[in-house]
Amino acid sequence: MYEPGTEQINCNGRLIELPTLEVVRPAPKMPSDANIDWLLHIYFTRREFTRCRRLIERELNRHLNPEYLYFVQGLIDREEGNHIEALRHLQKSAELNPRNIETYKEIGRTLYIMGRFSQALGVFREAEQRSSRQDHEIYHYLGELLYRAATTQSQKDVASQQQDEARTYFELAVQSGRKLESYVRLAELYRKDKQYQKAIEILENCLHLTPENSEVLIEISVLYLKINETQKAHDRLAEVVSIERKCSPKGLLAFGAILQSRNDIDGALSKYSQIANAEPEIAELWNNIGLCFFKKQKFIVAISSLRKSVWLSPLNYNALYNLSLIYIASEQYASAFHTLAAAINLRKDNAECYMLLGLCLRKLDDMENAFVALERASSMATGQQGAGRNPLVVLNFALFCYETGRLALSTEQYNRFMSQAQDLLLPTEYKFQATKLKSLLRISNQGNGILLDSADMGESDLGHNRATELLPDELPLEVNAVVSQN
């Protein structure tokens, strides 16, 4: 019978001694030339840098090929912020094995962190030449460095060429790998070129990688607002709310823009108030708040909000344009003149700014300069094609010419307006003004040329505050004011 805790067993009256089983494994002895790269890799992935350093110091002098030792030493130095030593060790590793592409990539990353972008670009180009396969990391960094170089380039042609090359590399990065940053950067470049549909497609594909990425969903909703797809934008923002229960300021701003575009001013202001409590230093926020109060005919509060927007972002064209509209609506023509001058300095090719400038000068009794401004606006509007054309600019010039006695020129501009507006659906108020001008020109009986019929055309108005109803891409309205951040 066996008794627990004893080393004997009673079997048929006899005591039998139990043998003691004891397995002793001696510690393995590594030969001096054994490869311990695997152990070093384990320590590094565990971030046990002290053990890594001791192991590297012990093995560096007796290792037959210290390439990996120098490589890991460089990575450790970079993690600890010692970039010069990291670069030195990585270069030693590259000298021992010039065919190792990973070493070149780490050298390029180190130079990128150090801010030596031109040198990093050269290293990644060399890595691209040495690589025998498509490497999405190399393509991504090449695109990133070229895009950075394009933003700091003073020569426009060179900057455009670098930006196109950066887009090509980001496209290669997206095709050869699944890196979130590459998708985001490529979409950013498409957005900068106003190719909003392509940017949306890229970000929709990005959602396959991270279906619940709220930042990507918000960016998609903003792009949908760019193309006036407010319902799709709302659906994407609803997904963000269902994921996070709370929207970021950018998402709330887009939510408010959607409500504002649907004339739900109080709902939009409630969204904006949430942003103002958390992050009040957002120029687009105060721009949109100003437009909400403008819709409520509260001019003083609207002007204060838009002036704060301009103060936060002095080069924000939309805020300057909107502020000038409110100044004109409140009959502050001198202030509107100065604000429009600042907006024109930012966009010298915008016909609507020159049109409003001409209206301000007319109200200030400077007829000569008003004629020059309106003439320039008309010539710009005539040269625009497609969705960019604004026949209201031409009609305003025609009305001004009639007012100042230039009947022949007024007739010419009226006919030009008719040819531009014949396939557009314009507000009824504009049609009334155009019909009135046509009647006045016929009564005067001095118009040179035949007046076109206005039976089937859209309309126009000298009313400056109606100019924003024509061009959805250029309007300083709520949606565009939000999504115009570049």
Curated annotation (Swiss-Prot):
Quote the function comment for this protein.
May be required for microtubule anchoring at the centrosome. Required for ciliogenesis.
Which protein family is named in the record?
Belongs to the BBS4 family.
Give me the gene this protein comes from: BBS4
- UniProt xrefs under SUPFAM superfamilies: TPR-like
> Where is it found, in Gene Ontology cellular component terms?
BBSome; ciliary basal body; ciliary membrane; cilium; cytoplasm; pericentriolar material
Q: Where are the TPR repeats?
A: 33-66, 67-100, 101-134, 143-179, 180-213, 215-247, 249-282, 283-316, 318-350, 352-384
A Gene Ontology biological process term: centrosome cycle
InterPro entries named in the record: TPR-like_helical_dom_sf, TPR_rpt
Q: Cellular location of this protein? A: Cytoplasm, Cytoskeleton, Microtubule organizing center, Centrosome; Cytoplasm, Cytoskeleton; Cell projection, Cilium membrane
> One matching Pfam family, short form?
ANAPC3
The name this protein goes by in its record: BBSome complex member BBS4 homolog
Organism of derivation: Drosophila melanogaster (Fruit fly)
Q: Which UniProt keywords apply?
A: Cell membrane, Cell projection, Cilium, Cytoplasm, Cytoskeleton, Membrane, Repeat, TPR repeat
From what superkingdom does this record's organism come? Eukaryota
Record GO terms (molecular function): dynactin binding; protein-macromolecule adaptor activity
